[in-house]
């Protein structure tokens, strides 16, 4: 297909239009008085959300060049979400501010490479300043406050604080849909290990790119599966019972994996394959832990067991299994409580006996997975639309809380970004590099300005007021007053704020140094739509 090219100012202006269209949609959701956005779905009811990355991913612009600009901003939101789990709207606002200020200067004749150096220098100084002002998460109240701010709900904040208290800061917390209208917290026996699906075609939820199996059988083996015939009798037994299957194996190679994927895509049965966790003796021990938890048997040569002879009775079972590209979570395994307790006691004995600190840490990790359980937040709502919106908020709050536990927290509401302006302004530079620093200085004001505007207040007035306040004092948009943000419990995870700024600066600098854009050329005479099928030919394939 022929390509269409645009250069210099023409290229940048088109991409800027795309940046603005996406950012103007996303930034209306920022802050406690931000609005929602309604997204049309290809099927089912529309989705109502204020989640920045969800909105960004949903936007496709008709103009190819504008769409490329929009997709670059969407990439900023996605990357921030992947790293920190929240802060996607802030990242979008920062990107728009840097790109707009940068484009003005490039159009006026500034060298984009010099501007890029200045942006990178200023961003580094801002991140260093953020780390210096960061507070550590010390109490349950700290966790509740961070989760409350992210979800705009004190009830959600308390729920997540309770969940983390029960399973620990590093514990496994999953979010499920409830059948009722109430949102509740349960702690169930479960385990998570760091292995994801072998093929993305095994996912059941394309939006989140994860596979969810309800009441599955679980095949646990330390063998490689290269020939589908080795497990064909077992697969047939699983299909006969209309159950899904999780396969945990050393590896699946040859024609076995494509065959499993093909049957999954055809709807023959629901199957997900993951590699066994760990290596060597630790792998054997972890597989045995999974077997005990799920009531299954490890199919291994050590026990003289073959895959061809494996029966349904040797498979483990669980209430639910969730598999992402990185992790597998098994919830409510069908194992005997007595056997689980015995396994826990055995691991505790090994912890006492070992002389290796490394081995002790690994044993404690296994013990936590086996005995700590999984906290399950069951989200309830009156309608499906409300349920999705509430679920997005709780997921954001959980991600924000984990980020805060990892790197601490700073004053919220964009206050921390205002507070680092002084450190960035001290940087020495000349020419276009100085211009790049000034661009970042202006962008650091933008989140506060947007939060204020969404609350119906003049943003520039708020920004100028905060510049004259002592560090930590910010604008509480919910109550329309200035106060010490940390003391008021209005905080943001340092990791979220840092990631939003770094990702925004990175993509913006690349966009400013773009000189040519190549896109697919629209067809002048698109092919006519296929005629409707003859009603008399029904049933033919």
Curated annotation (Swiss-Prot):
GO terms for cellular component: cytoplasm. ATP binds at residues 29-32, 86-90, 413, 476-478, 492. SUPFAM superfamilies: GroEL apical domain-like (SSF52029), GroEL equatorial domain-like (SSF48592). One of its GO terms (molecular function) is isomerase activity. Residues 526-535 have a biased composition (Low complexity). This is Chaperonin GroEL. PROSITE patterns: CHAPERONINS_CPN60. InterPro entries: Chaperonin_Cpn60_CS, Cpn60/GroEL, Cpn60/GroEL/TCP-1, GroEL-like_apical_dom_sf, GROEL-like_equatorial_sf, TCP-1-like_intermed_sf. Residues 521-541 are annotated as: Disordered. Gene3D superfamilies: GroEL, GroEL-like equatorial domain, TCP-1-like chaperonin intermediate domain. The keyword ATP-binding applies. Together with its co-chaperonin GroES, plays an essential role in assisting protein folding. The GroEL-GroES system forms a nano-cage that allows encapsulation of the non-native substrate proteins and provides a physical environment optimized to promote and accelerate protein folding. Belongs to the chaperonin (HSP60) family. It is found in: Cytoplasm. It is an enzyme of class 5 (isomerase). One of its GO terms (biological process) is protein refolding. It holds the Pfam family Cpn60_TCP1. Keywords: ATP-binding, Chaperone, Cytoplasm, Isomerase, Nucleotide-binding. Forms a cylinder of 14 subunits composed of two heptameric rings stacked back-to-back. Interacts with the co-chaperonin GroES. It catalyses: ATP + H2O + a folded polypeptide = ADP + phosphate + an unfolded polypeptide. It comes from Levilactobacillus brevis (strain ATCC 367 / BCRC 12310 / CIP 105137 / JCM 1170 / LMG 11437 / NCIMB 947 / NCTC 947) (Lactobacillus brevis).
């Amino acid at each position: 297909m022929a390509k269409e090219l645009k250069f210099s100012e023409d290229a940048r202006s088109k991409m800027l239009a795309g940046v603005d269209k996406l950012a103007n949609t996303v930034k209306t959701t920022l802050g406690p008085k931000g609005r929602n956005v309604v997204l049309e779905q290809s099927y089912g009811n529309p989705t109502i959300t204020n989640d920045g990355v969800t909105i960004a991913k949903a936007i496709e612009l008709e103009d190819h060049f504008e769409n490329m600009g929009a997709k670059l901003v969407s990439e900023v939101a996605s990357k921030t979400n992947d790293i920190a789990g929240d802060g996607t709207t802030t990242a979008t606002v920062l990107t728009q501010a840097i790109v707009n200020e940068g484009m003005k200067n490039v159009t006026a004749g500034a060298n984009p490479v010099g501007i890029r150096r200045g942006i990178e220098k200023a961003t580094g100084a801002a991140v260093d300043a953020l780390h210096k002002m960061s507070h550590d998460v010390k109490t349950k109240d700290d966790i509740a406050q961070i989760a409350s701010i992210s979800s705009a709900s004190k009830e959600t904040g308390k729920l997540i604080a309770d969940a983390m208290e029960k399973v620990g800061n590093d514990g496994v917390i999953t979010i499920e849909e409830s059948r009722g209208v109430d949102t509740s917290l349960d702690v169930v026996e479960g385990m998570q290990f760091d292995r994801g699906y072998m093929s993305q075609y095994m996912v059941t939820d394309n939006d989140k790119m994860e596979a969810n199996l309800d009441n599955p059988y679980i095949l646990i083996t330390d063998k490689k599966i290269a020939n589908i015939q080795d497990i064909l009798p077992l697969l047939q037994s699983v299909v006969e019972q209309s159950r899904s299957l999780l396969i945990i194996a050393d590896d699946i190679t040859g024609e076995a994996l494509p065959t499993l994927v093909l049957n999954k895509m055809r709807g023959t049965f629901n199957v997900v394959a993951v590699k066994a966790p760990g290596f060597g003796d630790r792998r054997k021990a972890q597989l045995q832990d999974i077997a005990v938890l799920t009531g299954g048997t490890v199919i291994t040569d050590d026990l003289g067991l073959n895959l061809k002879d494996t029966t349904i009775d040797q498979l483990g079972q669980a209430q639910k299994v969730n598999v992402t590209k990185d992790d597998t979570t098994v919830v409510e395994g069908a194992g005997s409580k007595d056997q689980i307790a015995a396994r826990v006691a055995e691991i505790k004995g090994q912890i006492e006996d070992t002389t290796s600190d490394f081995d002790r840490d690994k044993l404690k990790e296994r013990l936590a997975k086996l005995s700590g359980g999984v906290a399950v937040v069951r989200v309830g709502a009156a309608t499906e639309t409300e349920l999705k919106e509430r679920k997005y908020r709780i997921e954001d709050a959980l991600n924000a809380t984990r980020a805060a536990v990892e790197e601490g927290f700073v004053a919220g509401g964009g206050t921390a970004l205002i507070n680092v302006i002084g450190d960035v302004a001290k940087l020495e530079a000349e020419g276009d590099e100085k211009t790049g620093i000034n661009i970042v200085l202006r962008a650091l004001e933008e989140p506060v300005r947007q939060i204020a505007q969404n609350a119906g207040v003049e943003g520039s007035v708020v920004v100028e007021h905060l510049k004259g306040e002592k560090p930590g004092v910010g604008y509480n948009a919910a109550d329309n007053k200035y106060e010490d943000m940390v003391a008021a419990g209005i905080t943001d995870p340092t990791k979220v704020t840092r990631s939003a700024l770094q990702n925004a600066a990175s993509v913006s600098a690349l966009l400013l140094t773009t000189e040519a854009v190549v896109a697919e050329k629209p067809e002048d005479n698109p092919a006519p739509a296929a005629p409707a099928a003859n009603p008399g030919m029904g049933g033919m394939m």
